[in-house]
Amino acid sequence: MANPTTGKSSIRAKLSNSSLSNLFKKNKNKRQREETEEQDNEDKDESKNQDENKDTQLTPRKRRRLTKEFEEKEARYTNELPKELRKYRPKGFRFNLPPTDRPIRIYADGVFDLFHLGHMKQLEQCKKAFPNVTLIVGVPSDKITHKLKGLTVLTDKQRCETLTHCRWVDEVVPNAPWCVTPEFLLEHKIDYVAHDDIPYVSADSDDIYKPIKEMGKFLTTQRTNGVSTSDIITKIIRDYDKYLMRNFARGATRQELNVSWLKKNELEFKKHINEFRSYFKKNQTNLNNASRDLYFEVREILLKKTLGKKLYSKLIGNELKKQNQRQRKQNFLDDPFTRKLIREASPATEFANEFTGENSTAKSPDDNGNLFSQEDDEDTNSNNTNTNSDSDSNTNSTPPSEDDDDNDRLTLENLTQKKKQSAN
């Protein structure tokens, strides 16, 4: 049990005038400290702003000076090399001349996951950079690659084995370091490290190949645009459903593909819809023809019922005759032999027609084709005339008139005169 007298004394001490004054003094000290800190921060900010303003005022001059120095340095570095080696020099750095008394050892490192055309072209450039090259390829382990770059499709052993089957590769170094060090170069007697000139950024540095470039042992290769492992993976992810259906069709199970039961049924439903669409598109013409035939059959049945058999037979007969006329005319015009028989206007035919008395106008193919329509009209009219031939012959038969005899005499006289003129 606590003594009540001691508790009261402590409370009195806290509430005494001296303690209250001390509390106010503490608050004053805090305020003074905060004010001084704010002033110091403002002074620092002003000084920084002044320095930045000075820098911004000097940047155009600095830029001109730096660009001029950089251009002079680039010109000096390029003039040190022969023309055939200038393309291998990295921008802003020197390039060492290759040794002549031994094979040149070039090192190219990379993940080489899903070995593709871009990898092959880069290794080919390394191998063909000099006449006598030994190409060494380094492959980092799965542990380092997954930590620094991300998950891979193939394991490090599979990637190393893939590179051994490439014709340009002479040696494969497994468990290669992520950043090449001078000790690693000495260990494997490497003359050049090959990669494209784009800075390769990591967590520690802006360019992991910068120390190698400063040593003059960096060989620049050209990157193949549009081809990379990331591009291949993005294509697969973009068409994920299509590749799933492809693997299901080849016998893969949903457990192997890590697909849920709902996703599999969804894909099968989409597959059936696509199959129905393709079937409908293929058979659309057949369906149209069948519907057209059905329409004509129904139409004929309705015409028979409404018109009767006699009118329907007459209607069908006229339509068939018209179709036959068109077909015969087309066959006549398409036949080359009959087209040769058509007489066309010429001076010889006109001269002969003057003595024969025939019509001098030439017959066109359409005129000859119209003969079929005339013949068909005669056939149609023959049936009607035959029925009334007996009665019409008795009533309409009249002897030839005198005008007809006069016309015949004139034509004979004209012919005899023309023959005499031709003989003279």
Swiss-Prot record:
EC main group: transferase
Keyword Lipid metabolism: yes
Gene designation per UniProt: PCT1
Coiled-coil segments on the chain, per record: none
Entries under NCBIfam families matching the protein: cyt_tran_rel
Pfam families, A to Z: CTP_transf_like (PF01467)
PANTHER family: CHOLINE-PHOSPHATE CYTIDYLYLTRANSFERASE, CYTIDYLYLTRANSFERASE
Protein known as: Choline-phosphate cytidylyltransferase
Organism, scientific name: Saccharomyces cerevisiae (strain ATCC 204508 / S288c) (Baker's yeast)
Domain of life: Eukaryota
Ranges annotated as biased composition (Acidic residues): 35-44
Any GO BP: CDP-choline pathway
Cellular localization per UniProt: Membrane
Segments for region (Disordered): 1-70, 348-424
Catalytic activity, as annotated: phosphocholine + CTP + H(+) = CDP-choline + diphosphate
